[in-house]
A protein has these predicted regions:
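Bacterial N-terminal signal peptides that target proteins for export
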Residues: 1-9
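Gram-negative bacterial Sec-dependent N-terminal signal peptides
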Residues: 11-13
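Substrate-binding clefts and substrate-entry loops adjacent to catalytic sites
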Residues: 89-91, 122, 127
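Metalloprotease/metallohydrolase-associated module, dominated by Zn2+-dependent proteases
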Residues: 24-81, 124-187
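Mid-length scaffold segments of soluble, non-membrane domains
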Residues: 80-117
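Structured catalytic/translocation cores of nucleotide/phosphate-coupled proteins
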Residues: 22, 98-100, 104-107, 123, ...
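Sec/Tat signal peptide C-region and signal peptidase I cleavage site
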Residues: 17-21
Length: 187
């Protein structure tokens, strides 16, 4: 269902070299997106919000990081899932369809993390010329991601429109394949 939009731009200007930008330090307990590790019902550990009538909520994020070494900029992004903020109203009655809907929220976050990695890889700039470019590119990615998540819930009626849900699944999986060159090596 809806995504919790907690955003943490983790600026890791540590001077540790471009390789350090390949791994972003995630918040404690966060689950890093991985094609080999789909979400399971037990991952949804948060308490349901009584004010929301949704059956479940996925709290995903795109964490960003940057390094400078020898005045050379390198940046990356990583999709993550926050179990403590994600919930399912009645875990015993979570259907496979609902779990697929929630997984696709996480998959959409990964699509936008890959798009951001693609943009960051194309930024051939020095750190002293970086200015607010990293912030602007990251914020634009977050905005586009949020819009896609909202469109997904609206178009599928939170997964209740099965035909539209199937179409979104096909589209998102195709986008993941198209952006495979920007997947993390062990994701």
């Amino acid at each position: 269902m809806p995504i919790s939009w907690w955003k943490a731009l983790a600026f890791l200007l540590l001077g540790a070299g471009p390789a350090a930008a390949q791994q972003v330090k995630l918040p404690p307990g966060a689950i890093r997106w991985s094609a080999s590790r789909p979400l399971v019902v037990a991952d949804f550990k948060g308490r349901p919000k009584t004010s929301q009538g949704h059956a479940a909520l996925t709290s995903a994020n795109i964490n960003t990081g940057a390094t400078c070494r020898g005045n050379v900029f390198a940046g990356t992004a990583q999709a993550s899932f926050d179990p403590a903020s994600s919930w399912v109203r009645e875990p015993g009655s979570m259907t496979p369809a609902l779990l697929r809907h929630e997984q696709l929220h996480f998959d959409i976050a990964e699509v936008y993390a890959r798009r951001l990695r693609q943009q960051l890889a194309a930024m051939h700039t020095t750190c002293d010329r970086l200015g607010g470019t990293f912030d602007r590119i990251s914020q634009a990615a977050y905005t586009a991601w949020q819009q896609a998540e909202d469109d997904y819930d609206r178009d599928t009626n939170h997964g209740l429109q099965h035909e539209r849900q199937a179409r979104w699944e096909t589209q998102v999986h195709q986008q993941l394949r198209e952006l495979a060159a920007f997947a993390e090596k062990d994701a």
